[in-house]
Amino acid sequence: MYGETTLNKNHVIKFIKLKINNCLGCDEVEINFSKADNVHIIIYSLVTDMAKDLPAVTPVAQAILLLCSLTYPDSDSLETIPQLKIGKGSVSMSFKVYPVNKEEETEPESESDLDEGPSTSKQALERMVQRAERKAKEASTRNVHSKGIYVNVERRFDMYFALDTVSYYINGGKRQSCPLPEFHAKFFVRPQHSINLLRQLHEKCSGNWLKVIQSDGDGDAFKKFKDPDSPFETFVKLFESNPIKPNDMMGKLAKTCLHVNEAVRLTEREFILEVFNQVRHIFEYITAQEYTVWFLVPCLGDKDQLRSKTLEDFDLTKVRTSIRRAGDTSNIWWDHTDHNIKDILLVAFQLDLATHVNQSVLVISHLETLAEFSTMQYVTAFFMNDFYAKKNTEPKWICHRYLERIIDVALFLGVIVIIEYPSAFTLLQEGRHLIKCFQKENADSSRTSQWEIFEDVVKENESDLEFLKEAVGKVQQNV
């Protein structure tokens, strides 16, 4: 069952435990993941700023990427992690894989189908045997689907010859070793779009998300577009040889190839429009319908204005992204949009693309601007309501729980999402499990940084600002 079989399709993965041993700025850290759902929140604070092109900031998220993604597949990529020193340490994780392919589950059969019509003693005995075998098969299937399989995986950094290798065992069985890509192909699905590529969108693509969707996530987003006027056209030389005599079979083959190519091209266009539409829905939900996003797709030059438009009539190479406030008809182009709203649109694209490619693990990071905006909005609402809206009948200042809404979308889409959030003001519901990572001043100059990591939960008064209000009151009295 576990040989060459790929287990990542039609399965759900549940993280159980993560261990970081003498690496990534940690001595020994053990984290137990929440059993409630697959969205894990990491609250962190930094002493020194991290590079914006790092896929993850905290040791916890970096360890997850080291084990559950192909972000760092070899020694060269490992050297890009500033907190990782090659030559010591390891990271390990345990997770559970649940099969969810309903089509392969054995449905309970009616017992009456074996009892129709008269039967001899021999036939009755045969039916009893069949019924027992059927029930045993159903019980076995239910047992597998309820238990799933446990996987323990470790990646070590103290063996220079095996930096691209992981060791793992399934259900406590024999330990096996294999290259990281092989392990990843067995349990996880590779993300098709680089977060760094998305972040460079407004610099390279001027708001044209089409180029991001069509890019493979490696390098320049424009490299696939040799003809900017028709990015979906792929011209293939079917025959590159001397002229050949007409042949009915060759003609039919060429015609079939053209039909298939046309169907693929139209499917690509439908996919892009579907992504745009779903991103709009996600974006509107996270912003509480205060904003919407329009993807303005111009039509190709067509003199026949009366003819109904089809997918062929749109120029998908010149898509413009316009973010609008609810009820506003003016265009706010991507480059002129508030940075906090840009962050939300970026998150919306990540969530949607992760579901389209059946991505198992998604890390959302670098939400500093969104966190700052949410914190200031909350502080403003707190003080304005306290000083100017004391009566229940008076209008109230509000603040939006953007992070809570991002979690709602992630839960709905069913992807394992790791969210790194650089603020204690999460405004999350009481009781949600948190992983807190606080960077500390260097006690030893030989270490790049030290981290304090522990588990916590959202408390009822976690976002209480009474202490700040008292401090402001004392300052005003002194003045």
Swiss-Prot record:
Subcellular localization is given as:
Nucleus; Chromosome; Chromosome, Centromere
Q: Name one GO biological process term.
A: maintenance of protein location in nucleus
UniProt key word Nucleotide-binding: no
Q: Where is the composition biased (Acidic residues)?
A: 104-116
Gene Ontology CC: one annotated term: female germ cell nucleus
Positions with biased composition (Basic and acidic residues): 124-140
According to the record, the residues making up region (Disordered) are: 102-140
Q: Mind listing the UniProt keywords for this protein, alphabetically?
A: Centromere, Chromosome, Meiosis, Nucleus
Q: Which domain of life is it from?
A: Eukaryota
Function per UniProt? Essential for proper maintenance of sister-chromatid cohesion in both male and female meiosis. Mutations in ord cause premature separation of the sister chromatids in meiosis I and random segregation in both meiotic divisions. Required for chiasma maintenance in female meiosis. Mutations in ord reduce recombination in female meiosis.
User: Subunit details for this protein?
Assistant: Interacts with Sce.
What protein does this entry describe? Protein ORD
Protein species of origin: Drosophila melanogaster
